[in-house]
């Protein structure tokens, strides 16, 4: 998992409440057992004019010109600005996979669905909760200025405009912050203790060989 320390990027405004996980990545794309390749199908039903299916050549599909992510001014956006209760609906880890593989590193909203919020941290995507008033202000700024950018400083727990004129502090649990700063997912955290795990396994086999299908002589 990539480290998240400080990130500066273009902001894309998704001005919708209650965006559910089926909108983020529709159910037909959940058949894949791989963790990659979901980016082209993020927001598939809003992003394209036709019905998407796994295995399609997305480069040949007709784009919806009215969808925000298809507008030229938001191309290359890496910070998603949206409204309350983002990520609601059924639990699917494919949702943060799709957003991250699209290119987003952070999502700013007044609130998130709990399971989606937790899944974001496990996959290196930073969900940031700001007040509705702060989010409203950021929407106004994003609409007003082409290529509007923000800097997300996880170490200092602050979102700021690139000129440094405005700052928005945010909260994040210390353990989640530690994992993102160091690029640790669940597997990475476990592997940090690989020596102790091997030592435990060796001692367990010696003391309880029957648990390792070894004959006791």
UniProtKB/Swiss-Prot annotation:
Its EC number is 4.2.1.33. Pathway: Amino-acid biosynthesis; L-leucine biosynthesis; L-leucine from 3-methyl-2-oxobutanoate: step 2/4. One of its GO terms (cellular component) is 3-isopropylmalate dehydratase complex. GO terms for biological process: L-leucine biosynthetic process. Signal peptide: none annotated. GO terms for molecular function: 3-isopropylmalate dehydratase activity. The keyword Lyase applies. Gene3D superfamilies: Aconitase, domain 4. It is an enzyme of class 4 (lyase). Keywords: Amino-acid biosynthesis, Branched-chain amino acid biosynthesis, Leucine biosynthesis, Lyase. It catalyses: (2R,3S)-3-isopropylmalate = (2S)-2-isopropylmalate. The keyword rRNA-binding does not apply. Catalyzes the isomerization between 2-isopropylmalate and 3-isopropylmalate, via the formation of 2-isopropylmaleate. Heterodimer of LeuC and LeuD. Belongs to the LeuD family. LeuD type 1 subfamily. This is 3-isopropylmalate dehydratase small subunit. The gene is leuD.
């Amino acid at each position: 998992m990539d480290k998240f320390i400080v990130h500066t990027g273009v902001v894309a405004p998704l001005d919708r409440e209650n965006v559910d996980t089926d909108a983020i990545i529709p159910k037909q794309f959940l058949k894949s057992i791989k963790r990659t390749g979901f980016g082209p199908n993020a927001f598939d039903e809003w992003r394209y004019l036709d019905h998407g299916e796994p295995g399609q050549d997305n480069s040949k599909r007709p784009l919806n010109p009215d969808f925000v992510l298809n507008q030229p001014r938001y191309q290359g956006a890496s910070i998603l600005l949206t409204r309350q209760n983002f990520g609601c609906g059924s639990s699917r880890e494919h949702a943060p996979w799709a957003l991250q593989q699209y290119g987003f590193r952070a999502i700013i909203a007044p609130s998130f669905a709990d399971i989606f919020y937790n899944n974001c941290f496990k996959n290196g995507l930073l969900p940031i909760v700001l007040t509705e008033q702060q989010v409203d202000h950021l929407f106004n700024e994003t609409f007003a200025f082409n290529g509007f950018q923000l800097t997300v400083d996880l170490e200092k727990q602050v979102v700021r405009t690139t000129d440094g004129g405005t700052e928005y502090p945010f909260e994040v649990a210390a353990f989640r912050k530690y994992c993102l700063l160091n690029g640790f997912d669940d597997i990475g955290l476990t592997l940090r203790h690989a020596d102790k795990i091997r030592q435990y396994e060796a001692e367990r086999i010696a003391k309880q060989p029957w648990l390792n299908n070894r004959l006791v002589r």
